[in-house]
Structure formats: structure tokens, C-alpha cells
Amino acid sequence: PGSVPDYDREYLAEIDGARDFYMDTPLYSQLCYSNEKVQEKMIDSVVEYLLDHPEVDYLHFWLGDNYNNFCECEKCAQLSVSDWYVVLLNKLDERLTQKHISAKIVFLIYFELLWPPVQKQLKHPERFVMMFAPITRTYSKSFLGEKRVEGVKRALPKFRLNRLRFPSDLRENLEFLYANQDRFSGDAFDFDYHLMWEPFKDLAGVKLAEVIHDDVRALKDLGLNGMVSCQIQKAFMPHGLGIYAMGRTLENSDVDFDRLRKEYLSAAFGDHVSSVVNILQIFYDCHCPEYLRNEHSEIDARQAEAFDNGADRLREGAKQLRFLRKEESDKTVDLSLKLLAYYCELCAHYFLALGAKARGEAREKVREKFSEMHKFLFENESEYGNYLDSFYFDLMSEQILNSDWNNVLTA
């Protein structure tokens, strides 16, 4: 309270009887979308921007970020969240038409907006492009092979304002897509998060790259015409296979993943591919990405032992890579070996902390081992920070190590 001027407070969503920034963060704050002054201010801003930027062909028109943060006032309760969104979209379309602005408007289905509108419909769907953003999906599997069965519909979970949980299951996510496609048959694309948090869960990155490849191949069957990647920019450690697979498969969805893998690893590691593949396999021998995704039991003696063993093996792998560098004259290959050697050392520290967690050791012990990893990470950031997002590696590892294995987003 007090962070918002009183004369602006009426514009914010009312939650539990109060209107304020959600979690003290403007980005996470929804507005009172039934308020006509809010509607006009939002639409005026978009129109003004497009008049100033006639070069824009597609403009994204999103609501606030986060979830379970929509307005509970009496007027907003008259329509669903998605219906109020359609009201805004139709008003925006009308104003753009009046101004002879031809730009397409991208609307999103994300968190609460996954539930399709009930009472309202887009008046001119040709103005719009739909963006499917399955932020809570699992990346342990791909969409490949999933296809809508004509005539078969699964009921969506009941919408409960500000009391929602969101699915990790792929088919459940796709049911939301299909329900929205029943209401909107225009252009649509996938807005996905493969390279946002997942590089810090699938630490070797090879299986993740294959999921990316398969997801891109699946787009056509899902009625989606492309992909926008919401990701970190420094996604190149232990390698850049994930983003390479994404780009090449978007260019040609028929390309074989094994071919891409061999192309990339050969270009990056030259004659040392066999050794590198063996070292990357250590990660999968000693940790499963599903563990870091909270999809396995937190306390697991076998996984703890594997983490401890993996730490030793990764340190040996780092020694081997440094030895290979001694006679390597190719600068690209030398850099790739250097980055992988550092990454093995870093993950050896991480594995020791994860082993302590999997054994159920006291949080202080886990924290102590995390601190050693944290120190190693940031002591080397100036040298390796262009290739690895140190902030996100630190943040994600700390969250995983400190969590009680309860994902509040998903059912």
C-alpha cells in the first residue's frame, strides 16, 4: 500500500478487496479490464505506438504477467478473463480500422487466458494471430506424435478465478490449444521456453535439443505455423546444439536429428567428437533431467550415489578435455573443449550439492555445497560469462536445491 498513487489505484485489479501492485511488481499486475478508462488508455497507447511506427507488421498485445492475479471486482465478474480480453481486442481492432492501420495484432493464450472466451467472439479474426504459450508444460517429452482426434473433446478443468493450477502434461496443454482453435481458426504459432530454464535441468543438453527438434516437427500437425523462442541469449554451454537444432529444423522440418547432432558436434569439437560424446554421457549416467524438473522423488539414495559418482567422473572428464587442448590448433575446437572442461568442473560442484539434497541432508549442508559452486561460478564469470548465463545458472540451481519439490504452478 502506498506504492500506487490514489488517483491511479482504481485502474489496478482488485484482489482480496485491495487494489495494488501484485507482489509489488508492476509487470505482474493486472488491471481492472472492465473499467472503460483502463480500456481507453490501453488502446490509446497501442494506437499511438503504431502511428509512430508504421514499419510494424505484427504487434503483441498482452495483459499482465504471472497468474492468479486478475480483478475480482463486481463488474469484472460479469465476464470471464478471456471474454474481457476479447472486448479489448475488438475495441482495438475498431480503432485501428478507423485509423487505417493494417498491422496484425498478436493475442496470447497463456495462464488464465488458456481458457477460451465463453460469451465474446473476435469480430474480425483476420486482424489477429494467436500465440500459444504453454509455460508450465514438461520438456521431458515432445509434442511429436500428438495430433488432435476429430470428434474427440476432453473437458477442460473448471475455471476458478485466482485459484488455478496449470498442467505440465502435454496432452492437457494441447486440449487448451484445441479449445481455442475451435473459437479461432486463423494464423497461430508456438511461443515456447525450451532454452529459458531447461538448460539448467538437462545439463548435457542433448536430449533437450532432440525435444526441440521434435517439437518443431510437430508444429504443422498441431495447426501452428512457427515458433518464437522465449530464452536466455547465452545458451551455449556445454554447447549450442539446442539453438542449432531449432534453427535448422524451422528451416527444414524433415531434417534428421542424428544428422544435426553429428553436424554440430563435428563442427564444434573436430576430431574429438567421440571423447566429447562419452563425457556428455556422464551427465545422463549420473543424473536424469526429470529429477531436476521435480518429476521424481526428492529423496532418492540411488540418485544421490549417482550424483557423487558423477562429480568424480566429470572432474576426470575435465582433465581429459584439457589434455586434448594441448595439441589442438583449431581455435573453434579449442574454445569448445575449453568451455566444456569448465562446465564439467562447474557441474561437479553442482552434483555434490544435488547429492546432498537427494540423500536428505540438512538444508545447511546442501547450502554449504551450493556456496562452493556459487563461488566457483562467479570467480570464473569474467572468462566464461559470454557463453553461460551465470545469473540464471545460479538462480535455477539455488531454487532447485532449496525447493521442497512442490511445483505451485502445476497440478
Identify the meaning behind each predicted range.
Residues 338-353:
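Amphipathic alpha-helical repeat scaffolds of TPR domains
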Residues 1-262, 308, 315, 320, ...:
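Catalytic-core regions of glycoside hydrolase
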Residues 70-75, 287, 298, 343-346:
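The N-terminal extracellular segments of secreted preproproteins, especially immediately downstream
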Residues 211, 299-309, 331-334, 338:
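Non-transmembrane, amphipathic alpha-helical segments
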Residues 243, 248-252, 263-309:
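Long, charge-rich alpha-helical interaction segments
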Residues 286-298, 321-328, 353-360:
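Secondary-structure edge/capping motif, primarily at the C-terminal ends of alpha-helices
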Residues 272, 322-338:
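Flexible helix-coil transition and linker loops at the boundaries of alpha-helical arrays
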